Amino acid sequence: MSRPEAQGWCPTAFHPMMSGDGMLLRVRPQFNRLSLEQALGLCGIAEQFGNGLIDFTSRAAVQIRGLTPASFTKALSALQSLSLVSQTASHEALRGVLLSPEWQENDLTYRLTQALYDRLDELPELPAKFGFAMDTGRQPVLQGCSADIRLETSKDGRLLLIEDGADFGRSVSQDTAISALIALAHMFSQAIRGGNPNTRMRNLPSPLQSAQDEYAYKRQLSFASLPLGKTALGFHLAPAFGQTTSQDFTELLIQSDCAFLRLTPWRGLLLERASNLTIPPGFISDEQDPKLRIQVCPGAPACQSAKGNTRGFAARMAPRLGANPALNSKDLHISGCAKGCAKPQKTDLTFVAQNCGFDVIVKGHAWDKPIITGLDPDIILQNLDGF
């Protein structure tokens, strides 16, 4: 079955998206980093102008929910005063830059990112979901994250410019990397001219760079990411199912006594230099927590397309996963509709909300043919190991 048409764009601070609980606005801080003052200010804005709910995304961004047309303009102005949003919509649209979360000030990742920020005006108009990954640590950690153009290091330490989906990259120097990245973005813009404006790099029929080029080198494949818990830079944790409240987030920030925090592309946050942290309810710091194995969208009533309460179902399902050894190796996806926004890849078990119950799909996408339709949630929970 083919996938239903999903939104071809993501919300930004200037172009919020209407959802079931009002407008939602996305904030993409530079370097994926906020100061304590900025983070507390964001919580206050979410409480004052929205419904107090804050989403953490897989693109190292946060979303404020429940805005109205009147409160949106006030929220935007307040975010700009905190330097969390650009002064122009054109600049804000190009801030989709992911950084390897353990970057250090003035290291290669930092310098390349700063150079890109300085030259945003040189980029062409790009699809709304187009993004860049600065993944230049010793080992890539962002290969499982969404990005169209990547800078990575090879096993022998070369800096490579890589198109998403390619198994090779072009060798570039630190001085030429950003110029080459901008040139590749222009090549992409030319390649999709007259076609689908929402095309992504991985959808092109063939790479724009040649694998036969004398400067082409095999990329270093990696399944690494940043584990939850204590790290060299602080403490990495995640809100359950990617969402928290402004009040809970504020309490966490004050208790952590951190000066800065980083947003990670696993719907998490890295509290810099936090120590002796008591994890509050609603946040996860254990990689074995079964809630991490459930990918779930906001669901109803937050999403207008959703037909069921996905997060409530996920909260009931998580303890069953943890208590059943037969499910230890399975990943699950709960989707409010057949678009499968939370996880567009195949999953061991997918449950798609319908007006009555959930459809069950085994080793497929949310839009694939189900083996059972409209099953009662209680029956699903009683028979999780039987699918």
Where are these regions (language model features)?
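Intrinsically disordered, low-complexity polar/charged tails and linkers
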Residues: M1-P16, A224-S225
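Small-residue-enriched alpha-helical segments and adjacent helix-cap loops
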Residues: S2-R3, S19-I162, D167, S171-D175, ...
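Residues that cap or delimit alpha-helices
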Residues: T68, P205-Q212, S275, D376
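Generic structural signal of hydrophobic/aromatic residues within well-ordered alpha-helices
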Residues: A75, L116, M201, A211-Q212, ...
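Flexible helix-coil linker/hinge segments at domain or subdomain boundaries
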Residues: Q87-H91, S189-N198, D378-F387
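An acidic, glycine-/histidine-flanked metal-binding catalytic module
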Residues: T153-F223, R262-L263
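Rieske [2Fe-2S] iron-sulfur domain-containing proteins
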Residues: I182-A185, S189-R193, E214-Q255, A259
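Short Fe-S-cluster ligation motifs
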Residues: H333-K346, I361-F387
